[in-house]
Amino acid sequence: MAMLRVQPEAQAKVDVFREDLCTKTENLLGSYFPKKISELDAFLKEPALNEANLSNLKAPLDIPVPDPVKEKEKEERKKQQEKEDKDEKKKGEDEDKGPPCGPVNCNEKIVVLLQRLKPEIKDVIEQLNLVTTWLQLQIPRIEDGNNFGVAVQEKVFELMTSLHTKLEGFHTQISKYFSERGDAVTKAAKQPHVGDYRQLVHELDEAEYRDIRLMVMEIRNAYAVLYDIILKNFEKLKKPRGETKGMIY
């Protein structure tokens, strides 16, 4: 039978890594996960995440509504200039200029919440990755028979993969909010007389506020579900065949 020859010192390094990983995982389950569940549950109960009147989230839009008379005069001057100057490049440059209102700030209330949320997203993904690696290292050599414990490992691994996909999507969700809000602010600045664009900015802020609360809930639930399912099946996950077998990896 073909065998891969591994130097004893190399195997020793892998064994040290594996033992260290197992210790970290057991510490996570024994203390860190329960602590995070409690912390995130407390976060969800804070006034900052329980705003009943979402209109209080409204951030000021420093975009003045133009005077119709002055705008008409400005439009006439623009038409006159276009007649005199047919340079397409110059027209393109004029269109790319920023709005006359100056810079428009982010919604500070949303930004403050996101500054608290993003480290939590990073943390839960890293811990999930560590626990997933620990689980993979418990998978025994592929053999016929007595595979019920392996089936349990596979089910838990599927759950972890699903959680990882959901949590990774939070980064994209946050970036999408800023992109969409920036587009809405740009439209409101270019067409300040259109109230719908101004309202769109506020609607996006309210939607993101609701999403932030849901993301905190999902992170808390991820810790709780991982803690629960691993604790309930710890023996099967660690020793799927009732005894320690060689690693599949």
Swiss-Prot record:
Induction of synthesis: By IFNG/IFN-gamma.
Domain of life: Eukaryota
GO biological process: antigen processing and presentation of exogenous antigen; regulation of G1/S transition of mitotic cell cycle; regulation of proteasomal protein catabolic process
Pfam families: PA28_C, PA28_N
UniProt keyword Transmembrane present: no
Keyword Methyltransferase: no
Biased composition (Basic and acidic residues): 68-98
InterPro entries: PA28_C, PA28_C_sf, PA28_N_sf, Proteasome_activ_PA28, Proteasome_activ_PA28_N, Proteasome_activ_sf
One GO MF term attached to the UniProt entry: endopeptidase activator activity
Keywords, sorted A to Z: Proteasome
Region (Disordered): 60-102
One Gene Ontology cellular component annotation held by this UniProt entry: proteasome complex
Family under the similarity heading: Belongs to the PA28 family.
Assembly notes: Heterodimer of PSME1 and PSME2, which forms a hexameric ring. PSME1 can form homoheptamers.
PANTHER family in the cross-refs: PROTEASOME ACTIVATOR COMPLEX SUBUNIT 1, PROTEASOME REGULATOR PA28
Function description: Implicated in immunoproteasome assembly and required for efficient antigen processing. The PA28 activator complex enhances the generation of class I binding peptides by altering the cleavage pattern of the proteasome.
Protein's name according to its UniProt entry: Proteasome activator complex subunit 1
